[in-house]
């Protein structure tokens, strides 16, 4: 389960490192999919207090097993309100358009939310005053260079971090695609190369 680290590992690792996730920092991870599950594992290993956000009550136990200290169901207004103005950093991995304001209001003054999920259509425009009044930032990040990728691989080796995968045969690729579109994949599919026609 090391191959997906070159995408699903470095994509969350780079912004977590850049924005100094670590001891004494409260870090939110929005989404518990291919990128989000790695974000939780990495932020936990970096020593941050990790809060996972999901729209699904059924993912609470999975998020905790990945290393989340807390899990918030983002559809629950009371759970969201309990975290207003408390995050140093939020990594948003969701690749579907959604209300960014629901998460920027959770940032402390000078907090940053970094987007790594790329939706096919734009997010609704954020409320500017929500950013201005507390000097909050919305940023973006995409993978990393060779030295940072090597650093991430070394970090994962040191902490025993791998991507959670489902190994499939080459002849299952169409079925895997259909399942992925439906959201029926637990984190990452990996094709067993020994099943490729030679």
Residue ranges, per PLM feature:
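Adenosine-nucleotide cofactor-binding segment
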Residues: 23-32, 44-102
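Generic hydrophobic/aromatic pocket-lining and core-packing "Φ" positions
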Residues: 16, 40, 60, 100-103, ...
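Helix-to-beta-strand junctions that scaffold the AdoMet/dcAdoMet cofactor pocket
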Residues: 107-109
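Short glycine-centered segments of the SAM/dcSAM-binding site in methyltransferase folds
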Residues: 26, 111-112, 137
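Rossmann-fold NAD(P)-binding glycine/threonine-rich loop
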Residues: 117-135, 146-154
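A glycine-rich, Thr/Ser-enriched phosphate-binding loop motif common to dinucleotide/cofactor-binding enzymes
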Residues: 1-17, 30-38
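C-terminal hydrophobic helical "lid"/dimerization subdomain
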Residues: 146-198
